[in-house]
């Protein structure tokens, strides 16, 4: 069970929830989902700038000059971490000495999982490199794939797809904003608590909708859904591409087709901002149903404070509709 508003520091709740006259920090975020969380916490006090634009790929993105200038002027960069956006780690060196970076994956309350399927407790130091190698196919193609597919090990950065992490991140965002703007600490805390309660209610809805789909295998474009499937007790998704959404080799595609046949997958889901023809080609000739496109980073969702809930609800509904059609 997710703990709702208790995640928000009680000390911060002691101040009034009305805006005070204060210098609200200039915040830059990496992806729309993080921007939505920050917007929920800031409320009417301010609006974060989101670097990754609609249709952008978080794993490989080129900043525009205007965005680089925004980074230079930012008081606070709130991002998932270099595991998701290594290009931003390099760009963040332009931040001023007075600026702060909050990597949400590094919050102590974040539940982190490895691509290899294991999980580990997050300590206070960075743990950006792991020695777990992960082979997806197990059908004799691993050696050939090693020459073509990217390395697939270390921390899975898509942690916001676990709603419990979303709640923890809201609390961490509120705490960080409050350090920069103590006069409005009560506003940030109250907004974070309200958003956390809303996520808790949505989580219960999704549990009810997804319970009938447990035990059914499905195919996705890239390996981004482990937190979601783990949280809701679903079977691990069969990923056509790896966690960085790199183009799969011919050997990997053959292995995926073998795995789909052996595992009895019933649905396949394309992904927003990626060519659906790849998914269609993988399931061609099979009886697998094609579901609605999933959008794990929220780059195709409606911008604003409601984007995170929209993303989770849309993902849960798409899975429930297709997997529950039997």
Swiss-Prot record:
Disruption phenotype: No effect on growth and no effect on zinc cellular level in zinc repleted media. In zinc limited media, growth is reduced in an aztC mutant background and also in an aztC and aztD mutant background. In zinc depleted media, zinc cellular levels are reduced in an aztC mutant background and in an aztC and aztD mutant background.
Binding residue positions for Zn(2+): 59, 158, 222, 295
Disulfide bonds: 267-322
Assembly: Monomer.
Protein name, entry field: High-affinity zinc uptake system protein ZnuA
Compartments it resides in: Periplasm
Family stated for the protein in its record: Belongs to the bacterial solute-binding protein 9 family.
Residues covered by region (Disordered): 117-161
UniProt biased composition (Basic and acidic residues): 117-155
GO cellular component, one term: periplasmic space
Superkingdom classification of source: Bacteria
GO molecular function: metal ion binding
Organism of origin: Paracoccus denitrificans (strain Pd 1222)
Listed PANTHER family: HIGH-AFFINITY ZINC UPTAKE SYSTEM PROTEIN ZNUA, HIGH-AFFINITY ZINC UPTAKE SYSTEM PROTEIN ZNUA-RELATED
GO BP, one annotated term: zinc ion transport
Function: Part of the ATP-binding cassette (ABC) transport system ZnuABC involved in zinc import. Binds zinc with high affinity and specificity and delivers it to the membrane permease for translocation into the cytoplasm.
Pfam families the UniProt entry points to: ZnuA (PF01297)
Keyword Cell membrane: no
Signal peptide: 1-22
UniProt keyword list: Disulfide bond, Ion transport, Metal-binding, Periplasm, Signal, Transport, Zinc, Zinc transport
Gene that produces this protein: znuA
